[in-house]
C-alpha cells in the first residue's frame, strides 16, 4: 500500500470478509499473543508445578512485564475418561489443585490461562477429543477461567460423505459458532491447516487457509517446530516453518495471525545467532510469540532476546502486516513491511553458512533515492542516515532488523518486492525485450517489482514498463490500459482486469483455476487484497 506517514490509502479496492475472527471483529485479539506453551520443551511432561514455576520465573525475569502474559496448557493435561456428566476432567496427579484453581492463581499474578483440545474423537496423545461435545467443552473451559483454546486436528475422519477438507471445515466452523455465542468468547487457535501442508501440492492447504481467518484469531499452519528431544536440525525446522509463513502473508490482518509455531530459545541444537534469528523473523511477521522453553533456566543472553523491546513493538504493531520478501538470493532474504506511524521495517536473513556483505538499495524498501532516512538497528540500537543503500555484513544464520523513519517530504512507500510462485519458489523475471518468465530467485532487480496504486506491476529494472496481459504475459511500455492492471486476490491469484485471466507459471497467462499451484503467488506487503 502507499503510506504517507500514518495514513494508509487504498490501492485496489479491498473487500474484507464479513466475519473476522470468532466474533466478527478484530478486537478479541488485535495483536498477536505472547506467552508460554509446554509442548516443544516438555511435551506430555506438564503439571501444576511447571506452570507455577514458569509464572514465577516470567515475573522475576521481566517477561511478564515485556508482554508475555499467556500460559497455555498443551496436550496430555486431561484424564483419560470424561466424567459421568460427559464433561472433561483434568489429570489429578498432574494438577492436584485443579485447573480452575490454577487459572485463578495465575490470573492473580497477571496471566491468562489457555488450554488444548482436539477436533477429533481423540487428541493426538489419545485423550478425549471434542467431537460431539463442543458446546459442553467450551462451557467447561469458560467455567474454569480459560480464555484461549488451541484446537488440534488429530483423529478427524470424514462424515456424511464429506471430503477430508470439508470435514475439517465443518468441525472448525461448528466450534466457531459455539465460541461466538459465548460472552466473552474464547480466543480460537486453529490447527487445521497443519494437516494439509503438503509441499507436493498446496491446493488443499490453501483451500483450508481460505476459511480459517473467518473462524478464528490465529492458525497453526504447517509442521510442528522441532521438540527439545527431537531428532534432526532445529535450525532446519525453523527455516521450514519460516518458509511456510512467507507463503501466507495475504491472509494476515489485525485480528487474525499466521502462526509458525513456538519460539525455542533453549533448544540445545541452536546457536545464539540462530535463536536471535528465530525471534527477529517471528517479530517481523507479527507472529505469535509463544515460548516453549524451561523459563527458569534461560540464560541472560536468551532472556535479552525475548525481552527486546524494539522487536516486541514491531511484533505488536497495530497494522498487523506480515513482512514479505523484497528480494531472495541463493542465501540471503530481504523482507520489508510498513509499520504504524509511517515507519518502514527492513529484515535481512542469511540462510546460508557464509558471511556475505549484503547491499540493499532504498528502492527495494519501497523508498526513493535522494532522501535522508534515519535507520535504527533493532538489535544494538545503532542509528545511521541512509540515502541510497544500506550495507550489511551477516554472520551465518544471522538476521538483522532495521526500523526506518521517513521524513515528511519522502513519506510515500510503494509496495515493492518479488512476485514468486509459492509452489515452485520461482520469481517473476523481466527478461528484457518484451519477455517475462519465471526463474530461480537470484537477488536481481529484474525480479523486484513495484505495485502501483492502480494495480500496475513495474519491474525495478525499468519502471517505465508494466506487466501486460495479451496472448502471453509480457513487459511493455506503460500505457494505462486495463490489460496492464492486475488485482491480487485472497486465493493468491493475480488476475488481469482486461482479460480476466490469471498469471500462470509455465504458460504466462491462462484461465483462472481454483488454488492451482501454478497460479498462486506471493506479492509485496501492502498490496491490497480482493476477497473472493
Swiss-Prot record:
Disulphide bonds in the chain: 44-76, 124-154, 427-441, 466-478
Record keywords: Disulfide bond, Glycoprotein, Glycosidase, Hydrolase, Lectin, Secreted, Signal
Ricin B-type lectin domain sequence ranges: 410-531
Signal peptide segment: 1-21
Localization terms from the record: Secreted
Enzyme active site: 152 (nucleophile), 210 (proton donor)
SUPFAM superfamilies tied to this protein: (Trans)glycosidases (SSF51445), Glycosyl hydrolase domain (SSF51011), Ricin B-like lectins (SSF50370)
Reactions listed under catalytic activity: Hydrolysis of terminal, non-reducing alpha-D-galactose residues in alpha-D-galactosides, including galactose oligosaccharides, galactomannans and galactolipids
GO biological process, one term: carbohydrate metabolic process
GO cellular component, one term: extracellular region
GO molecular function: alpha-galactosidase activity; carbohydrate binding
Pfam hit, one: Ricin_B_lectin
Keyword Disulfide bond attached: yes
Enzymatic class: hydrolase
The enzyme's E.C. designation: 3.2.1.22
Record function comment: Hydrolyzes a variety of simple alpha-D-galactoside as well as more complex molecules such as oligosaccharides and polysaccharides.
Name of this protein: Probable alpha-galactosidase A
Species this chain originates from: Neosartorya fischeri (strain ATCC 1020 / DSM 3700 / CBS 544.65 / FGSC A1164 / JCM 1740 / NRRL 181 / WB 181) (Aspergillus fischerianus)
Classification lineage: Eukaryota, Fungi, Dikarya, Ascomycota, Pezizomycotina
Amino acid at each position: 500500500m502507499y503510506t504517507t506517514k500514518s495514513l494508509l490509502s487504498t490501492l485496489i479496492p479491498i473487500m474484507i470478509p464479513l466475519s473476522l475472527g470468532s466474533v466478527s471483529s478484530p478486537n478479541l485479539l488485535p495483536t498477536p499473543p505472547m506467552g508460554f506453551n509446554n509442548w516443544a520443551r516438555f511435551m506430555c511432561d506438564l503439571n501444576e508445578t511447571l506452570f507455577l514455576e514458569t509464572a514465577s520465573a516470567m515475573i522475576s525475569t521481566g517477561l511478564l512485564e515485556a508482554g508475555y502474559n499467556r500460559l497455555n496448557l498443551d496436550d496430555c493435561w486431561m484424564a483419560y475418561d470424561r466424567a459421568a456428566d460427559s464433561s472433561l476432567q483434568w489429570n489429578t496427579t498432574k494438577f492436584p489443585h485443579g485447573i480452575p484453581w490454577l487459572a485463578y492463581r495465575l490470573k492473580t499474578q497477571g496471566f491468562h490461562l489457555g488450554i488444548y483440545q482436539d477436533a477429533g474423537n481423540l487428541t493426538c496423545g489419545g485423550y478425549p477429543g471434542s467431537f460431539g461435545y463442543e458446546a459442553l467443552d467450551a462451557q467447561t473451559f469458560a467455567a474454569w477461567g480459560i480464555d484461549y483454546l488451541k484446537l488440534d486436528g488429530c483423529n478427524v475422519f470424514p462424515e456424511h460423505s464429506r471430503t477430508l477438507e470439508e470435514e475439517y471445515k465443518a468441525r472448525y466452523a461448528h466450534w466457531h459458532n459455539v465460541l461466538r455465542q459465548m460472552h466473552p468468547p474464547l480466543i480460537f487457535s486453529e490447527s487445521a491447516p497443519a494437516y494439509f501442508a503438503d509441499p507436493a501440492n498446496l491446493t488443499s492447504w490453501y483451500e483450508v487457509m481460505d476459511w480459517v481467518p473467518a473462524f478464528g484469531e490465529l492458525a497453526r499452519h504447517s509442521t510442528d517446530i522441532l521438540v527439545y528431544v527431537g531428532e534432526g536440525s532445529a535450525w532446519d525446522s525453523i527455516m521450514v516453518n519460516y518458509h511456510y509463513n512467507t507463503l501466507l502473508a495475504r491472509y494476515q490482518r489485525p485480528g487474525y495471525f499466521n502462526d509458525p509455531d513456538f519460539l525455542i530459545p533453549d533448544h540445545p541444537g541452536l546457536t545464539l545467532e540462530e535463536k536471535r534469528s528465530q525471534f527477529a523473523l517471528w517479530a517481523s511477521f507479527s507472529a505469535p510469540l509463544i515460548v516453549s522453553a524451561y523459563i527458569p533456566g534461560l540464560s541472560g543472553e536468551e532472556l535479552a532476546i525475548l525481552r527486546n523491546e524494539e522487536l516486541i513493538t514491531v511484533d505488536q504493531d497495530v497494522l498487523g502486516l506480515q513482512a514479505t520478501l523484497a528480494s531472495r538470493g541463493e542465501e540471503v532474504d530481504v523482507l520489508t513491511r510498513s509499520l504504524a506511524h509511517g515507519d518502514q521495517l527492513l529484515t535481512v536473513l542469511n540462510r546460508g553458512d557464509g558471511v556475505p556483505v549484503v547491499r540493499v538499495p532504498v528502492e527495494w524498501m519501497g523508498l526513493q533515492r535522494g532522501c535522508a532516512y534515519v535507520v535504527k538497528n533493532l538489535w544494538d540500537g545503532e542509528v545511521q542516515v541512509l540515502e541510497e543503500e544500506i550495507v550489511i555484513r551477516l554472520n551465518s544464520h544471522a538476521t538483522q532488523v532495521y526500523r526506518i523513519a521517513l521524513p515528511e517530504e519522502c513519506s510515500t512507500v510503494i509496495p515493492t518486492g518479488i512476485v514468486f510462485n509459492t509452489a515452485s519458489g520461482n520469481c517473476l523475471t523481466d527478461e528484457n525485450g518484451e519477455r517475462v518468465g519465471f526463474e530461480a530467485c537470484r537477488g536481481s532487480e529484474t525480479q523486484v517489482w513495484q505495485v502501483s496504486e492502480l494495480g500496475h506491476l513495474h519491474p525495478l529494472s525499468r519502471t517505465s514498463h508494466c506487466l501486460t496481459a495479451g496472448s502471453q504475459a509480457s513487459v511493455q511500455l506503460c500505457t494505462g490500459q486495463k490489460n496492464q492492471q492486475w488485482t491480487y486476490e485472497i486465493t493468491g491469484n493475480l488476475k488481469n482486469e482486461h482479460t480476466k485471466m490469471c498469471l500462470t507459471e509455465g504458460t504466462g497467462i491462462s484461465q483462472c483455476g481454483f488454488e492451482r499451484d501454478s497460479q498462486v503467488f506471493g506479492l509485496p506487503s501492502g498490496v491490497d487484497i480482493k476477497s473472493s
